[in-house]
Regions:
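Short amphipathic alpha-helical segments
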Residues: 46, 71-74, 93-95, 156, ...
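Active-site metal-binding motif and surrounding structural segment of the metallo-beta-lactamase
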Residues: 39-85
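Metallo-beta-lactamase
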Residues: 31, 37-39, 43, 51, 88-144, 148-234
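Accessory terminal helices/loops
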Residues: 201-210, 217-287
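Short, active-site-adjacent cap segments at secondary-structure transitions
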Residues: 67, 88, 218-221
């Protein structure tokens, strides 16, 4: 684990540069956010927390994708908070999530997978405080980008963004569980933009200077944090423009059909990009 701010530590898993965040209060009470990914890594995290004399007081799952709802008995039997919307979404799709977890990171305890406690009322776009047993000074911003009931944690000058604002992944829209378009939100692009606005408001309101994405490098400094927002908005704009063009296009058209973004050099990210471009085109043409 490495410290990124006073009381905020980050552990990075070998799979997909996945980041787990540990927030520690003065009395050693710790909040563990999105522990992952393999059982060995999660157990190692528990051992590292114990070795520092901290005690896990609560967990937090940013959103209902399988790699964000893992746990280990070694972390203790504590409430693991998530939004009611996220918990409902996971409940409706838990077997698929468990199969994905078992395939990519075998050996987790099925009984602990996604065993989450609903947060109290948290309107979309608002930021609300986490209550004990979570450490003091933790707030969550609830939004509708990427997955149902996604939240970000803001604490101690750090934004823990979940699966947004990554230097490795372009914005990944909520295109329905497992790509089931019938269950996708009506306006995933608009929801994503509103989420970016809500998070940027929180960055300004709470003087955030460090951003930890769910996957990828930590952004340190206000300029680096702002650059993540700029890059994600530019991608969404280019994606929307490209979706408005027919796939083969017309000669002489000055609206770009391609999306320039260095994150698309990754083969998996490029595949996700192609899928959401096709999703948006289908929505526009009523397919
Ligand atoms: Zn996700």
């Amino acid at each position: 684990m490495r410290q990124v701010a006073a009381g905020v530590w980050v552990a990075t898993a070998e799979i997909w540069t996945s980041n787990t965040v540990v927030v520690v209060d003065d009395d050693g009470a710790a909040l563990v956010v999105d522990p992952g990914i393999t059982p060995t890594e999660v157990d190692g995290l528990a051992a590292a927390v114990a070795a520092r004399g901290w005690r896990v007081a609560a967990g937090l799952a940013t959103h209902p994708h399988w790699d964000h709802v893992l746990w280990s008995a070694a972390l203790g039997d504590v409430p693991r908070f998530a939004t009611p919307t996220a918990i409902a979404a996971l409940a409706g799709d838990v077997e698929r999530g468990w199969q994905e977890a078992s395939s990519a990171a075998p050996g987790h305890d099925r009984a602990l997978f996604g065993a989450l406690t609903p947060l109290g009322s948290a309107p979309v776009g608002a930021d609300v405080p986490l209550v004990p047993p979570a450490p003091r000074g933790c707030r969550v911003v609830v939004h509708e980008a990427h997955a149902p009931g996604h939240l970000a944690l803001v604490t101690r000058g750090v934004l823990v963004a979940g699966d947004m604002l990554s230097d490795q992944e372009v914005p990944l829209l909520d295109v329905g569980p497992g790509g089931d378009r019938a269950r996708a939100p009506l306006d995933p692009l608009g929801g994503y933009r509103r989420a970016l606005a809500a998070l940027e408001d929180a960055v300004a309101r709470y003087d955030v200077a460090v951003l930890v994405p769910g996957h990828g490098a930590v952004a340190v400094g206000r300029d680096a944090v702002a650059a993540r927002f700029t890059a994600d908005r530019a991608y969404l704009h280019a994606l929307e423009q490209a979706a408005a063009q027919p796939p083969s296009g017309h000669a002489g058209c000055d609206v770009p059909r391609t999306v320039p973004d260095e994150r698309l050099a990754d083969r998996w990210v490029a595949g996700e990009h192609a899928a959401q471009l096709d999703f948006l085109r289908a929505r526009l043409t009523g397919r």
